[in-house]
Amino acid sequence: MTVRLILAKGREKSLLRRHPWIFSGAVQRLEGDALSGETIDILDSQGKWLARAAYSPESQILARVWTFQQDEVIDCAFFIRRLQQAQNWRDWLAQRDGLNGYRLIAGESDGLPGITIDRFQNFLVLQLLSAGAEYQRETLVSALQHCYPECSIYDRSDVSVRKKEGLPLTQGLICGEMPPALLPISENGMQLFVDIQQGHKTGFYLDQRDSRLAARNYANGRRVLNCFSYTGAFAVAALMGNCQQVISVDTSQSVLDIAKQNIELNQLDLSKTEFVRDDVFQLLRSYRAQGEKFDLIIMDPPKFVENKSQLASACRGYKDINMLAIQLLRPGGILLSFSCSGLMPVDLFQKILADAALDAGHDIQFIEQFRQAADHPVIAAYPEGLYLKGFACRIM
């Protein structure tokens, strides 16, 4: 008999709106014993069936919904259906944008909570971020092998969020061939190397694809500063947009080395590039003291907010770094500024940029707004899925 989780009276409203999370505070009782990650049924206080979900006893999110259809079984066929639904959309995007690298599964927004899958050529990179996802590992891999027999599958579930679920960090080959040290993918006419084994996340920031295209369109004739450059995809975009010069800054020499290889891979002019290993905050202050000026600054920092208690300090960090960037821009210059922190609301981020401009002594115009690329969809019932936000700001 399936274990049943009974909600407290009046706590079913979010599920009726098809939100996929059940928090521990919404629960009246659990009927039966469930293993971590096991599939359970969710009922309201009157015993009415609401959803089928994965149980996460170590997490504040006590259950994550697999399905709102009572007759749907969570088996290999279920995962195959979800994969096929997701692939239909990615096929269209891949053809439109010339892609052989994209996010295949974006967790809750593709009906597979706690599961991220990126495809790079014929390599599938898997992240299992919840107890339910881990519990279904073998079934999911079987579904992937059924749908993608040509693909190797590599595990990058080496992310700290698994600790909140009581799960160990895992990484390694699941099946097929080991990925090469650097694998090239195509994006809007660019070739970009992906480091599947050692790179950030699954190896590459696919979510910034549209923003890179925007940077390319803004770059013509401009002197560009690419902050938190990682492997230099924004630098490639700027060079393809005929920038005057692009300086890429990161604290890691290894990613800067890959950035240089990306420039060479696209047969672009290395003499127009500079790679600086430094702390961005310190370097911006040094540039300000030296009187350096730029026409386009790309500010794409790592996540500043891991939990709500860090939001206030993150706001200060975003404000400080964007103030410095605005001070380095010539009149008419463009700042492309981003936040990948899901806990940072877009309206608050916009206010931070406005305050940064005020402190910098400049007026700015918001001329364009960005979000994650379309292979990272946001299902209507789950607004938390919108984590990446950005603005193009013109300095007056």
Swiss-Prot record:
It catalyses: cytidine(1962) in 23S rRNA + S-adenosyl-L-methionine = 5-methylcytidine(1962) in 23S rRNA + S-adenosyl-L-homocysteine + H(+). It is found in: Cytoplasm. The keyword Protein transport does not apply. It comes from the Bacteria. Keywords: Cytoplasm, Methyltransferase, RNA-binding, rRNA processing, S-adenosyl-L-methionine, Transferase. The keyword Cytoplasm applies. GO terms for cellular component: cytoplasm. InterPro entries: PUA, PUA-like_sf, PUA_sf, RLMI, RlmI-like_PUA, SAM-dep_methyl-trfase, SAM-dependent_MTases_sf. Its EC number is 2.1.1.191. GO terms for molecular function: RNA binding; rRNA (cytosine) methyltransferase activity. Residues 2-81 form the PUA domain. It is an enzyme of class 2 (transferase). NCBIfam families: PRK15128.1. HAMAP family: 23SrRNA_methyltr_I (MF_01857). Specifically methylates the cytosine at position 1962 (m5C1962) of 23S rRNA. Belongs to the methyltransferase superfamily. RlmI family. This is Ribosomal RNA large subunit methyltransferase I. The lineage of its organism: Bacteria, Pseudomonadati, Pseudomonadota, Gammaproteobacteria, Enterobacterales.
